[in-house]
Amino acid sequence: MIDKAKLLALNSLKQSSNDLWSWHALLHVHDNENNDSINNNDDFNKINWSIYGPIKRHIWWHQSLILFYNQEYEKSLKLFDNYFSSSEIFYLDFCNACSFLLRLHYKGVDVKERMDKLKDYAEYFKNQHILPFIDYHLIFYYLYYNDQDYFQQLEEKMEENYLENSFKENYINYLKPIIHSMKTNELLNENIIKSQFKYLGGSFAQRELIFLSLIQNTKYEKNKSDLISEYNDYKSVSKLYV
């Protein structure tokens, strides 16, 4: 699958070297390979970023992940501060920033000042409950602050929204058990772990936050070992930083 994705991305870039979605596909491959060669690609470095919208910041997020995987934390923070940190209220920008900073936090890097700057955006999204993808980022964002008020009202507010929309099954079968496990310290069902949380939305690079956050916060060694095992089976570079 990875080889096919790489081939398709490269073929597409031969037709249009300015197609950011093709670069995005290639970066997914590079993330998995721990490959930073895109930084030396002449076509990539010639891109006029000023004409593009949020997708460019998502691409820079992918670049920062490669630096993270290589334990170049200061370089990755510089990329965050100079490029993909955004003052716009767009859900993907918030999710990108949140997931990146939490990764660094789990490695012992002080990100509190940067996390604090995301609070207004978190407040904007936290009661909407329109996408499980946004909500799982919010859950781990507020867990960083140990915000018990947020978690006490979370399930009730989510149920009001998700039980009435098309994400009902996604919420009941996947998101709710994660919340319940975190609140009660109960074991997370092994089948949920084996699903790689794909029904909560986003690519594996984005859902990676769920794995890393649960590994970091679970109180059960069985949950931790199951999460690490499933994660290592998928992510070829995972042993570098889990």
For every predicted segment, state its role.
Residues M1-N70:
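Internal metal/ion-chelating core segments
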Residues D3-K14, D36-N48, E72-S85, D110-F125, ...:
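Alpha-helical repeat scaffolds
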Residues S16-W23, Y52-W61, E88-S99, N127-H137, ...:
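Generic helix N-cap/helix-start motif at coil->alpha-helix transitions
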Residues V29-H30, L67, L101-L104, G108, ...:
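Residue at a conserved register position within TPR or TPR-like alpha-solenoid repeats
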Residues I55, W60-A122, D135-H137:
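A conserved active-site cap/scaffold subdomain adjacent to cofactor or substrate pockets
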Residues L101, Q153-K157, Y171-V242:
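C-terminal non-catalytic interaction modules
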Residues L131-I134, L138-F151:
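Non-catalytic interaction/regulatory modules that flank or connect domains
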